[in-house]
Amino acid sequence: MAASEVAGLGAGTPSPSESSALCASKSDESLPDGLSPKDSAQKQKNLSPPSVSSQMITKESNRNAHLEHPEQNPGSSVGDTSAAHEEVVGENLVATALCLSGNGSQSDLKDLTNPAGEEGDTSLRESLHPVTRSLKAGCHSKQLASGNCSEEKCPAASVLKEGSRDAGLDLLPVVPPANGVEGVRVDQDDDQDSSSLKLSQNIAVQTDFKTADSEVNTDQDIEKNLDKMMTERTLLKERYQEVLDKQRQVESQLQVQLKQLQQRREEEMKNHQEILKAIQDVTIKREETKKKIEKEKKEFLQKEQDLKAEIEKLCEKGRREVWEMELDRLKNQDGEINRNIMEETERAWKAEILSLESRKELLVLKLEEAEKEAELHLTYLKSTPPTLETVRSKQEWETRLNGVRIMKKNVRDQFNSHIQLVRNGAKLSSLPQIPTPTLPPPPSEADFMLQVFQPSPSLTPRMPFSIGQVTMPMVMPSADPRSLSFPILNPALSQSSQPSPPLPGSHGRNSPGLGSLVSPHGPHMPPAASIPPPPGLGGIKASSETPRPQPVDKLEKILEKLLTRFPQCNKAQMTNILQQIKTARTTMAGLTMEELIQLVAARLAEHERVASSTQAPPTCKLCLMCQKLVQPSELHPMACTHALHKECIKFWAQTNTNDTCPFCPTLK
């Protein structure tokens, strides 16, 4: 009866072999090495009835052995019922756990056994840990109880035990330690259990076969053990159900957390992508900025080089402009110097021409005087009755007149040719000097000629001004003074006074100085009334007329009246003013005293106005040598009023021992 109950219980509860056979198709890892799923299923089918009986026999023999030898196994003296109950419960739990995978909870167990699972399965692992420990203890006691059972007689049971053990070991969850120490200890316990199981397997294989022949009584305390087993089974089912409920709750919580974590992960990934994109944008922007900076740097360098080149060009241009300005200045200076040279050359050329013309005029003037003298004599001789002596004198004077005219023409031709050569560019010093013509002595005059030309004291004309007051043309200082000095043409003419140029007011009037052209040669002269006047001398009357008043006395009276009217002027200033008035009017004839006084007053007022306007620096005079303005610092001090440069008078001052002025004999 007990055997039947055990068999019924064994048939009602799934055995480890059946559970392993059901789960063999799900996982191939729980099978032993060298067995395929088909082979294990076939063996389990063939060996299932004997396995139950062999298990029951083994249990009964183990129980009897423990009862008979309590001292030999003190560790297994807890009781056969407890050992058998634990073994059956462990096998049922293993089978139930293996069968859960076939009922659709394989994913849940995989999640529980996965060591890299979520953090929320800690409570499930803690609740399953004592169950797995109890399963390990039951399996260990079962191996110790069936140690005398040979592997040859119970091959299916050993295979199922090993499969259930392997499946139980594979299903053990890895509990992460709270502090890193407990996990290490649990792993060490698991390693020790697995090593003890392996050792027990090896010992079970190497056990003597004679122990399998022992007999065990299985009828003792069966019902009590079955009741306990059923109670434990119910409790385990309830605990298992609680564990499943907790697992579902934890799974739901884990799903929520997983969704939150996934959402957070997505957000983090999105943020990460955005950050990566921002980093990429910043990197691109940095590269672009770097390229832009390099480009700008190159542009700046190029611009700097261009600016340097432009600066060099500008500097070169500035230097060139300075050189051009200096060149222009030098050109202007050279042009000015050339102009000055041309002006000086032209001035010297004009001075040379003026010198030649002055000398020509002087020589021609002397020859014209001789010509007029000859004409005068011929005119008188023609008016006299012809006699042998007068004819001879007339011939001599005609010969002299022709010679003088020829000589005058030659002098003019020579001087004109020299003037033309000088105008063409020849130097005066390089031209041959024109000799001064020498007149032959005049023919001797007869006694009647001497009587005719003997002037009467009562008829001696007086000049309105003294001869010394008449100024001759000024000779340029550059001319040779020696070339301007002429010898006296005729000794007879030298005794007579030189004719002065007629005054502007005397044009058309009778010349009062014709009687002074010829000086008397004899002390006796006939009366002028007995000599008829020559026909060409109209205006000279030999009648006895009252003599004119002397012009000098009249000029003195005019000066005295003017000095009385203008006491601020002296005699020299008044004479100068009268000369200016005469130069401006070309004549003083026909002026009344009142008109003359008005002209003098106007001239004095003009002088005062000019003096007041040019009061600042004194007017510079012209140098008589170079005809340039003489500055006060360059003026050579002299006793006279002549102005000369120090450099111009330097050679004269060194060579002249008397240190006199070259234009006047006044000493310093």
From Swiss-Prot:
Keywords: Acetylation, Coiled coil, Metal-binding, Phosphoprotein, Zinc, Zinc-finger. It comes from the Eukaryota. Residues 43-59 have a biased composition (Polar residues). The keyword Phosphoprotein applies. GO terms for molecular function: zinc ion binding. Residues 220-379 form a coiled coil. CDD domains: RING-H2_RNF214. A zinc finger (RING-type) spans 623-665. Residues 523-536 have a biased composition (Pro residues). InterPro entries: TTC3/DZIP3-like_helical, TTC3/DZIP3/RBM44-like_helical, Znf_RING, Znf_RING/FYVE/PHD. The modification N-acetylalanine is found at residue 2. Pfam families: TTC3, TTC3_9th. Residues 1-87, 103-125, 486-552 are annotated as: Disordered. Residues 60-71 have a biased composition (Basic and acidic residues). The modification Phosphoserine is found at residues 15, 40, 48, 54, 196, 497, 511, 516. This is RING finger protein 214.
